[in-house]
Amino acid sequence: MTAERKLIVLDVDSTLTQDEGIDLLARYVSDEAAREVSNITALAMAGKLDFAASLTARVQALAGLSLDDVVSATAHVRLSVGAETLVHSAQAAGHLVAAVSGGFHEMIDPLAAALGLDMHRANRLEARDGLLTGKINGPIIDAQAKRTSLREWAAQHDIAPANTVAVGDGGNDVLMLSAAGVGIAYMAKEITRAAADVIIDTPDLSLVLDEIGVPRV
């Protein structure tokens, strides 16, 4: 698979990173909010709840949280083992690496900049006077939007669908994995594993390189 340029699109929460960003944010609200949001996240990622509806409910729980708290929570986000190796090795081989997330630009922008991702897309939190309103600003990045992002980026860069790779763990990654030339389930829920061409059960994101024939640097 190394002869032609590839597009590798990564989910963020629990794939590119070890954490669910919205769960980290909820801890800054209250213990009760943290438990509620974490439970909804688990059900949504297992494909047992509609993602858009579940995200709307979880974001409502963040109303009143300050943007300073968002910055503080972002500082606690942990990259997955092997994430930097995956990104840098793929780019060194001439491939593009992107991220698309049902999480938030406010948390993902610094991560994308630090890693040097070629493209990224996520939801935006609405804020007023420095406080979150509990709403999303703009369209929700759901399963359909993830699939659309993969296809749009591939078309923009003249990359054939067969040369696209999608990596994710949750139910909202299924459409993206199914649309990619190679769909990789990484430490994934059962619903995601069933849709994948490749399953990685070891917590090392650089193993994606081995599956798509890209050398490590």
Give the residues covered by each predicted segment.
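Alpha-helical substrate-recognition element adjacent to the catalytic core
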Residues: 1-125, 203
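C-terminal cap/substrate-recognition subdomain and adjoining C-terminal extension
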Residues: 74-217
